[in-house]
């Protein structure tokens, strides 16, 4: 399959202008590409067809055929959709789309409101799930490795991108406190720590799995990595962390998966000369938490 370039899209646009006799407009155009060209490029870049995914990857809701301004967000929430429309985008690219295999297909409740907003706002919805987790340049896990100054060694199952999680080696060891501080700052989030925590403990060997990635530890009776960075953790994760001596950094599902999609948006904007609106929400950071120590009865 031929990979699209900005020059190829430019050639297509000039041909269209000549056919439609729109030469005066060529001097003042805003660049565009077809949505089919965008999804074809993303399918190949992210190797989307190599994954067994619950998500329907690619175009999920059709809007304008021409793409001039993209918005990127972690999830196709109503807030993200409204933000993209207000920014004047014609295409919203997300990690978590609206349509999943085996899920209730009825367009009712808030899902109806999301689709209604997309259609009325004339906004394409494009989603890539596991391909965005596993990509070694633009993926969620690769981004987590990058912000810590780490190099991706391989996938958790060597050579198997469908295992999603990655083994990471830091260029220089960092303390637990330093890693937590970097994650808080770069992801704009709160970080919870599980395991026998010593703030000055040095770490250089990590596993990373964005989103609900605690299964990397939950299912590994003898983990060989010092620490795991993930979005969510469950009850079993706590016990495995304590019993195996593995430290777990829990950064929040949304926070672990929203920056890489914006990085992908920057790449698309630069490559195809599109406008780009990155959407960022500090959901986990803004959620209030309580720990009330009192003898008072409630």
Predicted regions located by residue number:
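Polybasic, lysine-rich low-complexity intrinsically disordered segments
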Residues: 14, 20-21
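Active-site catalytic microenvironments in core metabolic enzymes, especially phosphate/sugar-handling
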Residues: 33-298
């Amino acid at each position: 399959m031929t990979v699209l370039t900005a020059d190829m899209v430019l050639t297509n646009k000039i041909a269209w202008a000549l056919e439609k006799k729109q030469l005066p407009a060529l001097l003042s155009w805003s660049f565009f590409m077809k949505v089919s060209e965008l999804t074809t490029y993303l399918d190949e870049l992210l190797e989307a067809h190599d994954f067994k995914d619950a998500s329907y990857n690619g175009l999920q809701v059709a809007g304008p055929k021409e793409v001039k301004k993209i918005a990127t967000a972690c999830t196709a929430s109503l807030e993200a959709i409204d933000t993209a429309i207000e920014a004047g985008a014609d295409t919203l690219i997300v990690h978590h789309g609206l349509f999943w295999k085996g899920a209730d297909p009825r367009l009712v409740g808030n899902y109806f409101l999301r689709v209604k907003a997309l259609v009325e706002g004339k906004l394409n919805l494009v989603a890539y799930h596991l391909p965005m987790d596993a990509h070694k340049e633009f993926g969620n896990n690769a981004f987590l490795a990058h912000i810590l100054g780490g190099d991706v060694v391989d996938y958790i199952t060597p050579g198997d991108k469908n295992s999603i999680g990655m083994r990471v080696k830091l260029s220089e060891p960092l303390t637990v406190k330093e890693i937590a501080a970097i994650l808080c700052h770069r992801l704009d989030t709160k970080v919870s720590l599980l395991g026998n925590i010593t703030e000055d403990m040095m770490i250089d060997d990590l596993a990373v799995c964005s989103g609900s990635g605690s299964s990397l530890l939950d299912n590994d009776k003898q983990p060989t990595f010092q620490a795991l960075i993930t979005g969510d953790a469950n009850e079993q994760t706590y016990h495995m962390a304590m019993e195996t001596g593995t430290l777990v950094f829990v950064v929040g599902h949304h926070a672990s998966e929203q920056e890489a999609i914006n990085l992908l948006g920057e790449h698309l904007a630069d490559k195809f000369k599109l406008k780009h609106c990155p959407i960022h929400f500090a959901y986990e950071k803004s959620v209030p938490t309580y720990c009330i120590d009192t003898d008072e009865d409630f």
